[in-house]
Regions:
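N-terminal "arm"/small-domain region of PLP-dependent enzymes with the aminotransferase-like
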Residues: 11-73, 204
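Active-site phosphate-binding strand-loop segment of PLP-dependent enzymes
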Residues: 52, 152, 156-208
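PLP-dependent enzyme catalytic core of the Aspartate aminotransferase-like
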Residues: 60, 64-68, 72, 95, ...
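Short loop-beta-helix segment that forms the pyridoxal 5′-phosphate
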Residues: 80-86, 94-118
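Conserved PLP-anchoring active-site segment centered on the Schiff-base-forming lysine
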Residues: 119-138
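Active-site C-terminal subdomain of aminotransferase-like
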Residues: 202-205, 212, 217-323, 336
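Conserved PLP-binding catalytic core of the aspartate aminotransferase-like
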Residues: 299-348, 358, 362-363, 370-372
Length: 397
């Protein structure tokens, strides 16, 4: 298609996105990622919309470990893993992840999007079935689409609907249940104990994406397997190094050895993407050492979550129930969520409004993400701003 035809087409499409209020503008941050940041022309704000759950994105111990890894192992690998892109650091990190999740083996990816996108196709054929939660992350949805297996979708965390799908899929050779550990828009946790019970009843594998739950959910923050004590009953975990685990980039799949071995042979994002850079691998190894030494960051995070949620509920806000670090402040109206977020930034609080098509129509909200990097004064300032803006816009009295 020539530029003469294609350019007007894209221009019209972009105009439609803007008219619908769905155009995404990127606000520029000029400081390291942490609780207090500067945006645009030096405006100082408190950040309540990062995935920086354990506050490690600017941790000096991790920064030093990254520098040390570059000194000892270089800047980049210039190769995929199976050619000449595997260093001792990569194998050490895979072992550390396996130890953390109590699994047999682990495979690293450039991102969790790649881990999920490259998971199903190597393991399943058109004789098999994938049963996926309706609110799963886009990366799981795309991974399912790339696979020839028959697809079933059950209502979010609805065990009766999951059982219906499992019954319908009994004619298929193999079945796998796919779910997020924490659903990113509502902050609710998948009921893994019940999911595992149904998997055992109907002879299905279980896969869970721990991206928003690892480091956060569970008595010591080890994720949904710890929360529901289902170690050994979940076959596959996927996750990211880009949220609680330091916030850089990189993803992984961890689970049974034969599954991981098959992914090394046939998972296309693994086979055809560069290895994770040594600096990220070295810092991630140090991060897992830190989490072994102490769970103080997790304790602080959950204290912050409880404090913020309780104060917001007392002020009259509608907050979705949560066991995670995600607090969804429900506003329901799309324009209201945009106006609310803009006014919050004027008060020095950086939050984002989410609305259709990211969430269902009539379910607009501000998604607040708490961090161990937040101090009590940060929380109090954010709560005061929510109350002020909430009263101005008629959300609370």
């Amino acid at each position: 298609m020539s530029e003469r035809v294609h350019k007007p087409f894209l221009t019209k499409e972009l105009a439609g996105i803007k008219e619908a209020g769905l155009y995404k503008n990127e606000r520029i941050i000029t400081t390291p990622q942490k609780a207090d940041i500067k945006v645009n022309a030096g405006e100082e704000v408190l950040n309540f919309c990062a995935n920086n759950y354990l506050g490690l994105s600017n941790n000096q111990r991790l920064i030093q470990a990254a520098k040390d890894a570059m000194d000892s192992h270089g800047f980049g690998m210039s190769s995929v893993r199976f050619i000449c892109g595997t260093q001792d650091l990569h194998k050490q990190l895979e072992a550390a992840i396996s130890d953390y999740f109590k699994t047999e083996d682990t495979i690293l990816y450039a991102a969790c999007f790649d881990a999920n996108g490259g998971l199903f196709e190597p393991l399943l054929t058109d004789e098999d079935a994938i049963i996926s939660d309706a609110l799963n992350h886009a990366s799981i949805i795309d991974g399912v689409r790339l696979c020839k297996a028959k697809r079933y979708r059950y209502a979010n965390a609805d065990m009766a609907d999951l059982e219906r799908c499992l019954q319908e899929a009994q004619a298929q050779r193999h079945r796998i249940i796919a779910t997020d550990g924490v659903f990113s828009m509502d902050g609710n946790v998948a009921p893994m104990d019940k999911i595992c019970e149904l998997a055992e009843k109907y002879d299905a594998l279980v896969m869970v994406d721990e991206s928003h739950s690892a480091g956060v959910v569970g008595p010591t923050g080890h994720g949904v397997a710890e929360q529901y004590d289902v170690y050994g009953r979940v076959d596959i975990f996927t996750g990211t190094l880009g949220k609680a685990f330091g916030g850089a980039m990189g993803g992984f799949t961890t689970g049974r050895k034969e599954i991981i071995d098959m992914l090394r042979q046939r998972s296309r994002p693994y086979l055809f993407s560069n290895s994770v850079a040594p600096a990220i691998v070295g810092a991630s190894l140090e991060m897992f050492k830190m989490l072994k030494e102490s769970d103080a960051l997790h304790t602080k995070l959950m204290d912050n979550v409880t404090y913020f949620r309780d104060k917001m509920l007392a002020a009259g806000f509608d907050i979705k129930p949560t066991q995670s670090a995600i607090c969804a402040v429900m506003l329901y109206d799309a324009k209201l969520s945009q106006d609310f977020a803009a006014k919050m930034q004027e008060e020095g609080i950086y939050v984002t409004g989410f609305y259709y098509p990211v969430v269902p129509k009539g379910q607009a909200r501000i998604r607040v993400q708490l961090s161990a990097g937040h101090e009590r004064e940060h929380l109090d300032k954010a709560i005061a701003a929510f109350i002020k803006v909430g009263k101005e816009l008629g959300v609370i009295k």
